[in-house]
From Swiss-Prot:
[4Fe-4S] cluster 2 binds at C192, C208, C236, C239. Catalyzes the conversion of epoxyqueuosine (oQ) to queuosine (Q), which is a hypermodified base found in the wobble positions of tRNA(Asp), tRNA(Asn), tRNA(His) and tRNA(Tyr). InterPro entries: 4Fe4S_Fe-S-bd, 4Fe4S_Fe_S_CS, QueG, QueG_DUF1730. Keywords: 4Fe-4S, Cytoplasm, Iron, Iron-sulfur, Metal-binding, Oxidoreductase, Queuosine biosynthesis, tRNA processing. The keyword Nucleus does not apply. It catalyses: epoxyqueuosine(34) in tRNA + AH2 = queuosine(34) in tRNA + A + H2O. Its cofactor is cob(II)alamin; [4Fe-4S] cluster. Monomer. It is found in: Cytoplasm. It comes from Gloeobacter violaceus (strain ATCC 29082 / PCC 7421). Its main location: cytoplasm. This is Epoxyqueuosine reductase. Pathway: tRNA modification; tRNA-queuosine biosynthesis.
Length: 319
């Protein structure tokens, strides 16, 4: 017997997800595809070729016959102190176990349960692994809203959440889209050191520290990026740490209880000097099961040396 929306949500929460919502497969009505097309046409994707996959604009091409999109969120925030002088700065999302692994296992389990409950249906899970506009679907499913920092912001956890989706051929009762509560706030726009937020909710990856420290494979970082690194070597959280909803979540003690997201040694206190001389063997050992592996050892060495050079000495000061 086909599971109901309520049963699926209950099962998702039992599997550990903090938020779950459902959107109809026609909920975006082409608006998201149009926005994505404009973003790509402006060149804002940089060298991220996979963003041009045409399936990203039409979910029916991802799963023919899809009728509902089940969206989940899992908080990953952990308490962070001020970085010490010379400490390498790593985005919070990368300090613990790779989120693809942490979310992927229970999400696939949920998809299998749905298909087992109704053998005639399809249910396919994605965790930042397919041509799916995750934030747009999460907003449509009522999990939160796309903020001016281009992150999905939730009332309970701010933007410190990982997202996952299950595309299914089941026709499920949908949630209402989440209202946007950013209002007149522009803190994130002002906080970005490279002006990568070219307008509210629009990131020009070519100007973004996170893009360059993770996705840019060039031997050297652009000077316009390096001079604003302030110790960042994997990602950048500046447009999130200033967000009132993230600050409120921290005041409320809304930190993730998921043990896999606890910062791992040595990443939570490694220095720029250490990373500048990182060996391939050390990287392979330390990055096992970590999203940092995407950056590669050569990328970390480049980023650390760039940050050290921009600081004027071996102690890059935090922003």
């Amino acid at each position: 017997m086909a599971p109901t929306a309520a049963q699926i949500k209950s099962r998702a929460r039992a599997l550990g997800f903090h938020k779950v919502g459902i959107a109809r497969a026609d909920a975006l009505d082409g608006e998201a595809a149009e926005r994505l097309g404009g973003w790509l046409a402006a060149g804002y994707a940089g060298e991220m070729r996979w963003m041009h996959d045409p399936r990203r604009r039409d979910i029916q091409q991802v799963l023919p016959g899809v009728r509902s999109v089940i969206c989940v969120a899992l908080s990953y925030n952990t308490a962070q102190g001020e970085p010490a002088p010379g400490q390498a700065r790593i985005s919070r999302y990368a300090l613990g176990r790779d989120y693809h692994k942490v979310l992927g296992k229970p999400l696939k389990e949920l998809a299998r349960w749905i298909e087992a409950s109704d053998p005639g249906c399809r249910a396919v899970a994605y965790v930042d692994t397919g041509p799916v506009q995750e934030k747009a679907w999460a907003e449509a499913a009522g999990l939160g809203w796309i903020g001016k920092n281009a992150c999905l912001i939730t009332l309970e956890y701010g933007s410190w959440v990982f997202l996952g989706e299950i595309l299914t051929t089941l026709d499920l009762e949908a949630n209402d889209p989440h209202p946007n509560y950013c209002g007149t706030c522009t803190r994130c726009l002002s906080a970005c050191p490279t002006a990568a937020l070219v307008e509210p909710a629009v990131v020009d990856a070519r100007k973004c520290l996170a893009y360059h420290t993770i996705e840019n494979r060039a031997p050297e970082l652009p000077e316009a990026i390096a001079e604003h690194q302030h110790g960042w070597v994997v990602g950048c959280d500046l447009c999130q740490t200033c967000c009132p909803f993230n600050l409120r979540a921290e005041r409320w003690g809304r930190y993730s209880e998921v043990a896999d997201f606890a910062p791992r040694d040595p990443w939570n206190e490694i220095t720029l000097d250490q990373l500048a001389d990182l060996s391939d063997a050390e990287f392979e050992r330390w990055s096992e099961g970590s999203a940092i592996r995407r950056v590669k050892a050569s990328g970390l060495r480049r980023n650390a040396r760039s940050a050290l050079g921009a600081s004027g000495d071996s102690l890059a000061q935090a922003h």
